[in-house]
Amino acid sequence: MKLLFDFFPIVLFFIVYKFFGIYTATAVAMVASLTQVAFYRLKFQHYEKMHLFSLAIIMVLGGATLFFQNPWFIKWKPTGIYWLSALVFYGSGYIGSKPLIQKMMETNINLTTKIWYRLNLAWTLFFIVMGALNLYVAYHYDTDVWVNFKLFGGVGFTLLFVLIQAFYLTKHTDEKSFEKQ
């Protein structure tokens, strides 16, 4: 259910774009992101950092898209999120005691420090590639193709990456790791 909630703004953006165009879809995505953050705060009594991060980016780039009537700002949003995520993941390997991926997953899985750092680097590289791929699609194809890629390509590649990662992790864990769940 949380996964569907996380994709709420992008799914609304996609649907509204198909009927009303990029500017209305951008405005709806901005409102949906704000609603998402407020709802999460009311329901769980705290903010989800990723929601706040995404909200800040969509408000700035979505606002610029609407103000300048230029869709290129919103087309840069996924790349901004991907590349800032890459920077955070990469930096976490040097700042603090553990890489970010370990902080996120260590209660569910037991890995060596070396594997945690490899996994963190893999996510860093994934985010860099996804940001570049978003720009490639945005600059080489029309907006219709980019909107489809934003939803289906972004989600599809992420699920594929998680699946590949799961296979990789099975080689580096034992059954006791999964008993914690």
From Swiss-Prot:
GO CC, one annotated term: plasma membrane
UniProt key word Transmembrane: yes
TM region(s), chain numbering: 3-23, 54-74, 81-101, 119-139, 149-169
Domain of life: Bacteria
Pfam families, per the entry: IspA
Membrane topology label: Multi-pass membrane protein
Keyword match Lipid metabolism: no
Entry keywords, A to Z: Cell inner membrane, Cell membrane, Membrane, Transmembrane, Transmembrane helix
Cell compartment(s), UniProt: Cell inner membrane
Matches recorded under InterPro entries: YciB
Record's function text: Plays a role in cell envelope biogenesis, maintenance of cell envelope integrity and membrane homeostasis.
Similarity comment: family membership: Belongs to the YciB family.
Name this polypeptide is given: Inner membrane-spanning protein YciB
Organism annotation: Legionella pneumophila (strain Paris)
